[in-house]
Each structure stands twice: as structure tokens, then as C-alpha cells.
């Protein structure tokens, strides 16, 4: 996720930020038996799909898998700047 954001926006992230994100992905993997690469791919695909309909702030995006008893929930916090005009009221 950080690699994608860095490539798109050209922002540098500190080593601490990168290490923190990697640790978070490892912890999610341990709790849900989902690989960090799977979660990263999921985030990238969510960005791709949601960006068709809305302008979002990728750097503020947070996608996690949370476990409670025997269930896993996908929790996404995605800051939306605005809806794209072509998507408003369009039907597929």
C-alpha cells in the first residue's frame, strides 16, 4: 500500500512508517491467517474500484480485518473527497 501511494503521489515515508505498516500487516496475518500480500492486494483493488466512483484520499485510507470470536470482519475507513459526476446517477 505504501509503495503504491509513494509511486502515485511521490511522497517519501520514513523507515518508521514503513516498519509500522509492515508490522500491522504481520499482526493481521497472525490473527486472521491472511497473508500480508493478500491484504495489500485487497487494498489496491479497493482503491481501483472505489476511485471509479469517488475521489478518495488514499493516504488516509485504513483497511483492516478484525476478528471477533469465530468471525472476521473487513473494516474500511476511506476518506472521500467528492463523488465523480459520471458516477452520480449512472446505472450499469
Swiss-Prot record:
Biological process terms in GO annotation: cell division; regulation of division septum assembly
Biological role: Prevents the cell division inhibition by proteins MinC and MinD at internal division sites while permitting inhibition at polar sites. This ensures cell division at the proper site by restricting the formation of a division septum at the midpoint of the long axis of the cell.
Pfam assignment, any one: MinE
NCBIfam families cross-referenced by the UniProt entry: minE (TIGR01215), PRK00296.1 (NF001422)
Disulphide bonds in the chain: none
Entry keyword Cell cycle: yes
Recorded family membership: Belongs to the MinE family.
InterPro entries, A to Z: MinE, MinE_sf
Keywords for this protein: Cell cycle, Cell division
Naturally occurring in which organism (per UniProt): Symbiobacterium thermophilum (strain DSM 24528 / JCM 14929 / IAM 14863 / T)
Name of the featured protein: Cell division topological specificity factor
Amino acid at each position: 500500500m505504501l509503495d503504491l501511494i509513494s509511486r502515485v503521489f511521490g511522497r517519501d515515508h520514513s523507515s518508521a512508517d514503513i516498519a509500522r505498516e509492515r508490522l500491522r500487516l504481520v499482526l493481521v496475518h497472525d490473527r486472521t491467517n491472511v497473508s500480508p500480500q493478500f491484504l495489500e492486494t485487497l487494498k489496491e483493488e479497493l482503491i481501483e474500484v472505489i476511485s471509479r466512483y469517488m475521489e478518495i484520499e488514499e493516504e488516509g485510507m485504513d483497511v483492516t480485518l478484525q476478528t471477533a470470536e469465530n468471525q472476521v470482519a473487513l473494516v474500511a475507513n476511506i476518506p472521500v473527497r467528492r463523488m465523480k459526476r459520471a458516477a452520480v446517477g449512472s446505472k450499469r
